Amino acid sequence: MRRSFYASSTENTPMMMTQARVLSTGTTDNGTIRYDEVDETKRWFNRRFCFLTVIGIAVLLLAMVVIVVIVLLLTQLKAANSNAQNAMSSSKVQLEELTRKLSQPLEQLGPTLERLSNMPGFPMGPSPTTQTPPGVPPISPIVTGPNTTPESPRRSPKARYEWKGCQNLGKCELSGYTKPPLVILSLDGFAREYVDRNIVQTLNHIADCGVKADKVYPSYPSKTFPNHYSIVTGLWPESHGITDNSVFDPTISPVLESMKSTKYEKFFEGEPIWSVYKRKTGKKANCLFWVGCAYNNSGYAPDVAPAYNQELPFRNRIDTVVEWLKLPVDERPGLITAYLHEPDNAGHYQVDEEDVDEKLAEIDENLDYLMSRLSEEKLLECINFAILSDHGMQLIDKTYYFQDYLDLKGLITAKGVVGRVYINDTTISVNDVVDKFRCKIDTVKTNTRSDVPTRKHYSRDPRVGEVLLEGRAGVTFYKSKADDYELSGDHGYDYFNPKMHTIFYARGPSFKQNTTISPYQNIQYMNLWMNLLGIEGAVETNGTIGFFDNILTNPPRRDNPTNVIGECPMIAFPSVLKCSGNVSAETLNQLSVKLTNCAFSPTNIPLYSDNHCFQNYCDNSVIVSRKGNDARRAIIEVLSRDEASNPSNFTFLNAKYQSNCPSHIPTGSLTIRQNSQLSSMVDERIDVPNNFLLKVLDPLQAKSMEYLNKFGKMYVISGTATDINHDGIADSNGSVITHIYRIMLICNSTWLLMNPPLCTDSDSMDTLSFIFPITEQSTIDCMSSDDILLDYTATIFDVERISGFQFGIGALSQNQNTIIRRKISTKLW
């Protein structure tokens, strides 16, 4: 066994054999060690030890270097991590600030950033426990595969509404805003029913500090271009020329022109608000995509009106409006009209309601952004701001094609839920076209300009077409299958359809707080705009001045008219002048006594006119023209269910006003209670075609008696009118009767007075009015009696226009009378 060289000689000597000596030559002899041999060994050891020492020191130094490097790296990493966190935090703040301040919002960065913002850890997106600043849009993650994550509830708002609250209402902190600018923002196709989905909560917060409409009726037809132009002119489509989205007028163009792209300014009639404002004040008006802004038909175009660009994000549009409002006072527009094309587009192409709901959520976010920006810029309390819409939306489930029913040669057809036919060939008559449709298609009404209900105000202008088709809700018309857009939703229907109803919200220093106005039609807006801009009455409109007084903080004082209709000139003492029939002398004497007894009793007719007078028949009155040779009459009846019946078969006049009976006594009757002696007045008689008598007049009388029995008392005005050109306005020559009308008033509380009519609670007064064109043939042939009556309802204002007098109750305020006169009835009692 080999021993270690480090063993001592003393220890090892006894174990060595005597013969084993180390010779100087390197051999052993007898156990003796040679010293030269030992020195060599030491030298070898020393050399090896030094080498190992050097290696060890080197390894140690290397280890120390590694440790130092690791420590330095750890220190650097820690510092880098801290810097990174600070940088991320700083970037987040900067990006959030940029989002609020830059005129190019996040939407311009594209859908990718919008979707990334909500990804966990992404610096722009809100963390689960961190609120994002106002104005920053919530952004969804990009989904590259099937989305298995359930959506959040549709009605959970993403907006923050940090601007809401009324604590600073009317307190403008900026200088140069003594006259508040007016901003009108339209949300195309925002139906009244969308409000009830409770998604666009920004509107609720606006109403808390301002005003809202219960609902708004569009003008007929409820299409985008006609209604947007009605909103800024105060005129019905038949009066401002934009009768639909597409219009044919051979005096302007030989083809059906789209109002989206037409080059002809002549289509746009009437004077829009921006023109009136500039003309009357000399101040600036800017327009962002509103219908008509691109056409200078009056000589006063908007100062700024960019070309329409549907791709421009809503945030950019909002920022544009805000930047306009921030301009110096001499550059700032006093009027801004702005347009957003949603949710109309979503409604047209919706697969289900969720598609519209999603767009409503986006609208809420954008409106919240708008209000936040106005608040941040301290503009919110310095401007009058209105949000409104033009129409609603209806799902489509049935389509008819003109070519399936007509030879289209010589005809021009216009698509839509109101199908229109223009006759462009003089050899084709209106009846030729009408006969192809009238009562041929179930639930489709066929009208001509002569029998369109007056309330629609869609017959004055030939641009409406010669024949109009309108089906039930859900029906639409196209020229052919090839022309069918296959829309899932559309609009244009009669405003009776609740899905066509729309919205109005407003706030600002000129508006009351938390106030709701009763329903109205959008032609009323123009008078509101002129009032807010200080130019009230600058142009005539189809609306009524003062309609919005009850939502304004400082409405002007208004009085009722003073030209109450007076009594007709007396030519003799009251007595009965018999004209036809058989009657006893005793009966005539009793009736003469009755006329004498009431002849000088106070009579207050709730009508205003300089051109009419009344003839007193006690509980009845006859309204006639002061001009001679005028066949038009109006009969006022004060009716009670408990009045005794007294049938008669004669006719008479009151000799107090007339000395001669007419040569012809008509057989029809305008009075409701036809079993009384006073119903035998000659002036209440009328001749009408048999079909009209059966389909209109008889059902009207029966329904009126039904109402009298139901409500107990009624105040009724029935009359005849002349409107040969179908413009809804009384003709100057009244020799030919073309229409009949009726106004019925009841009290849902109790009557304070019957003559003139007055309820103990003025808000409980209800009215129902009708105007019927007198025709032998019309679409009524295929309608039920109630459908006919409802279709031909009208406002009192409509009756005023076609009769020539104005209605008003002296005991009511001008605004109360205005609300009654403009009330639209969408159902029978």
Swiss-Prot record:
Membrane-spanning intervals of the chain: 54-74
Keywords recorded for this protein, A-Z: Disulfide bond, Glycoprotein, Hydrolase, Membrane, Signal-anchor, Transmembrane, Transmembrane helix
Cystine crosslinks: C439-C782
Keyword Transmembrane: yes
Pfam families, alphabetized: Phosphodiest (PF01663)
Membrane topology (UniProt): Single-pass type II membrane protein
Active site location: T224
Gene Ontology molecular function: hydrolase activity
Membrane recorded as keyword: yes
Glycosylation sites (chain numbering): N296, N424, N514, N542, N582, N649, N733, N748
GO CC aspect terms: membrane
Compartments (UniProt record): Membrane
UniProt xrefs under InterPro entries: Alkaline_phosphatase_core_sf, DNA/RNA_non-sp_Endonuclease_sf, Phosphodiest/P_Trfase
Superkingdom as given in the UniProt entry: Eukaryota
EC numbers for this chain: 3.1.-.-
Family: Belongs to the nucleotide pyrophosphatase/phosphodiesterase family.
Function noted in UniProt: Probable phosphodiesterase.
Protein name, as recorded: Ectonucleotide pyrophosphatase/phosphodiesterase C27A7.1
Native source organism of the sequence: Caenorhabditis elegans
Taxon lineage: Eukaryota, Metazoa, Ecdysozoa, Nematoda, Chromadorea
Gene designation per UniProt: enpp-1
